[in-house]
Amino acid sequence: MTNKLDGKALAKKIKAELQQKVQSLQIKIGRPPGLAVLMVGDNPASGVYVRNKEKACTQVGITSLGKHFPTQTSQAQLGQVIQKLNQDPQVDGILVQLPLPKHLDSTSLLYQIDPSKDVDGLHPMNLGQLLRGEKGLRSCTPAGVMRLLQEYKIELQGKHAVILGRSILVGKPMALMLLEANSTVTIAHSRSKNLEAITKKADILITAVGRPKMISAEMVKPGAVVIDVGINRVIDEAGNSQLVGDVQFNSVAQVAEYITPVPGGIGPMTVAMLLQNTVERWSTLVE
């Protein structure tokens, strides 16, 4: 019988632990943690993600210092806001919600964030510390994957992990974290040939490509662990909108030993890791 990796339940547990930590340290520090999420424009999906993050902040006791800017906001204006937040002692974490309008350079803005407040873990300083195996703020989605695997006591050492996708958000930091855990890592991508032959060798298969239901049961090794990072909105036969992953869940669940659902798998874990990074950064003020 396939075991479901319940990211939603684990995220709830993590948030409860973070809430207790905030309550216990708030008197010593003199204020709650503060997270500033910057959103530009009116992308509906981004709006949903930002509201989810703000709701999660409230549950844990983090002050949400979010700012919403009109679409025409300039690069210089956003840069000035980031510099002010870098200097603001009430702000522990800064996050720029992606995607941004086309006239804005997200990489340039990311570089302007103080690395110690980069709770998304995407600043070159934090990615460099990951590469070197040093402590630092970790990218939220791959960190959430690792935490979920740890919770279910899934052995990583010596296992062959295949990652589909090479983005700086998921694929590349995911590979580094798995290497840190002594896995043997293969990264496949849009130019990889004979994909099924690659995925069939995976003890742990992690998909982050954004292609609805591309992974079939025939592509999965019996007994594998399947982590579906993909979040795709599709229209079903009845004309209703629904969220699906990169994996054909029902058929792959017949083959895999463990599998994450979409929704309810990695999505909640990503938010939980964002909150954890924010609280951890804030808690250093005690020391």
From Swiss-Prot:
InterPro entries the record matches: Aminoacid_DH-like_N_sf, NAD(P)-bd_dom_sf, THF_DH/CycHdrlase, THF_DH/CycHdrlase_cat_dom, THF_DH/CycHdrlase_CS, THF_DH/CycHdrlase_NAD-bd_dom
Keywords carried by this UniProt record: Amino-acid biosynthesis, Histidine biosynthesis, Hydrolase, Methionine biosynthesis, Multifunctional enzyme, NADP, One-carbon metabolism, Oxidoreductase, Purine biosynthesis
SUPFAM superfamilies, alphabetized: Aminoacid dehydrogenase-like, N-terminal domain, NAD(P)-binding Rossmann-fold domains
Gene3D superfamilies from the UniProt entry: Leucine Dehydrogenase, chain A, domain 1, NAD(P)-binding Rossmann-like Domain
EC number: 1.5.1.5, 3.5.4.9
PANTHER family: C-1-TETRAHYDROFOLATE SYNTHASE, CYTOPLASMIC (PTHR48099:SF5), C-1-TETRAHYDROFOLATE SYNTHASE, CYTOPLASMIC-RELATED (PTHR48099)
HAMAP family named among the record's database cross-references: THF_DHG_CYH (MF_01576)
Protein name (record): Bifunctional protein FolD
Gene: folD
